[in-house]
């Protein structure tokens, strides 16, 4: 029995500096998936992370279901992944391996899997990273963000050249070079064009394209 998804379509990975619109792009894709112009809305799976700044300058980071309301049964402690204050202060690998893994593996055929974002905090979470690569090996469409570091540069839709040492963390480089991934280096100049390409890849053949405003 064939999957409801199209195995020929690439997964999408975005890589960009801060304040270039990657979160806005993902939120637009999520809204459009839910506002299907033809047929049923596309289910959203996966995770998004959010920072909450404290009065002492420390930002605490929590994991949430992608595009969804948080179940009241999931306490904040179970979603806490770490904190930063200019740099990483602490990390909770168990949250990635338990809650994060469960959110990734909840994805079902016919849906869209969001992973926003994958960075350096996950390096000691093997179960989570295994789930990430299983998703990239699979046919459920993935829209993910990989952490940007200085030196990351490649044309939109293209992987970095062989030998480039552009990503800290072997797993981040493996994500970018995965054979099923189409990598987009997002900038303020190309973000609208990238949005058009991403929505075409994810939605063509599934729902009518709709007019949209620039990001």
What are these regions (language model features)?
Residues 2-9:
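Phosphate-binding P-loop
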Residues 14:
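Hydrophobic anchor at the beta1->P-loop junction of P-loop NTPases
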Residues 18:
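The conserved Walker
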Residues 22:
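Conserved lysine of the Walker
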Residues 25:
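Hydrophobic positions on the alpha1 helix immediately C-terminal to the Walker A/P-loop
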Residues 30-83:
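N-terminal phosphate/diphosphate-binding loop that engages ATP/GTP or pyrophosphate donors
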Residues 81-130:
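Phosphate-binding/switch loop-helix module in NTP-utilizing enzymes
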């Amino acid at each position: 029995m064939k999957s409801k998804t199209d195995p020929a379509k690439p997964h999408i990975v975005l890589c960009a500096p801060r304040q270039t619109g990657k979160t806005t792009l993902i939120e637009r894709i999520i809204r459009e998936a839910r506002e299907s112009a033809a047929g049923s809305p596309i289910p959203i799976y996966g995770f998004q992370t959010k920072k909450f700044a404290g009065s002492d300058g420390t930002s605490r980071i929590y994991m949430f279901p992608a595009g969804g309301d948080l179940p009241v049964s999931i306490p904040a402690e179970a979603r806490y992944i770490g904190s930063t204050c200019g740099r990483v202060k602490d990390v909770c690998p168990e949250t990635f391996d338990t809650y994060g893994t469960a959110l990734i593996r909840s994805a079902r055929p016919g849906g869209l899997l969001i992973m926003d974002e994958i960075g350096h905090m996950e390096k000691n979470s093997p179960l989570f990273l295994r789930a990430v690569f299983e998703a990239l090996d699979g046919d459920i469409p993935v829209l993910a963000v990989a952490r940007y570091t200085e030196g990351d540069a490649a044309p939109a839709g293209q992987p970095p050249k062989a030998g480039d040492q552009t990503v800290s963390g072997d797993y981040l480089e493996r994500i970018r070079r995965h054979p099923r991934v189409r990598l987009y280096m997002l900038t303020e100049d190309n973000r609208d064009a990238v949005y058009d390409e991403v929505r075409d890849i994810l939605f063509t053949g599934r729902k009518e394209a709709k007019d949209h405003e620039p990001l």
